[in-house]
Regions:
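Short helix N-cap motif at coil->helix boundaries in the Bergerat
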Residues: 61-68
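Beta-strand secondary-structure signal
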Residues: 35-37, 52-54, 98, 144-146
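Short beta-strand-loop-beta element adjacent to the nucleotide/active-site pocket used for signaling
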Residues: 39-53
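GHKL-type ATPase core
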Residues: 77-170
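Mobile ATP-lid/nucleotide-binding loop of the nucleotide-binding subdomain
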Residues: 72-74
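Acidic ATP/Mg2+-coordinating residue in the GHKL
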Residues: 57
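Conserved ATP-binding N-box helix of the HATPase_c
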Residues: 2-36, 86-92
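Short loop/turn segments at strand-loop or loop-helix junctions that form parts
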Residues: 11, 37-41, 145-151
Length: 170
């Protein structure tokens, strides 16, 4: 039952790989960052519970080839010993994963892609719903992944990650 932790680890690992890929393309790139934000809500009994989490990086972005890889199970072309299985932890642990990504394409222009990855999208075999894609006004690449909602209580989170101070998250 470590699915939530594995999903979180997968998301952070993807951010680290995106930063590493950007450094290969831009050797002078030094502003690497990953920001993790966890949001909670109060229920009717005034108990805090997880509402959603956002993991944002300023790595390479989910460019066209990366998105095509994302759409193929067992595709190892990314490298880093990946096979495309980690995203299924997201499906099992969260109701929906919302991606917003900006990337620099081969034509020298920035593009945005917004899509949902969810069991709700089971009408297609990929579980993907593309919301929009097109040219961007941004001048740097980045990806935000919103994971919502957690389907467990505080004690479950403590059991999976005893180092997370859930009581401090408001």
């Amino acid at each position: 039952k470590n699915d939530i932790f594995l999903a979180f680890k997968e998301a952070v690992s993807n951010s680290l790989e995106a930063i590493k890929s950007k450094k290969k393309l831009q050797p002078n790139y030094e502003r690497a960052s990953i920001v993790i934000s966890v949001y909670a809500k109060s229920d009717t009994a005034n108990e805090e519970s997880f509402d959603y989490m956002i993991i944002k990086d300023n790595g390479i972005g989910l460019e066209t080839k990366g998105f095509q890889r994302f759409c193929q199970y067992m595709n190892s072309s990314k490298g880093y010993n990946n096979k495309g299985t980690g995203r299924f932890f997201l499906l099992k642990s969260f109701k929906k994963a919302k991606y917003e990504s900006s990337y620099l394409d081969e034509d020298g222009k920035y593009y945005d892609v917004y899509f949902d990855f969810s069991i709700e999208n089971r009408a297609n075999d990929l579980f993907i719903n593309i919301i929009s894609e097109g040219e961007s006004s941004k001048t740097d690449s980045e990806t935000s992944l919103m994971l919502l909602p957690f389907d467990c209580d505080k004690e479950s989170i403590r059991r999976y990650n005893p180092f997370l101070n859930i009581d401090a998250v408001k």
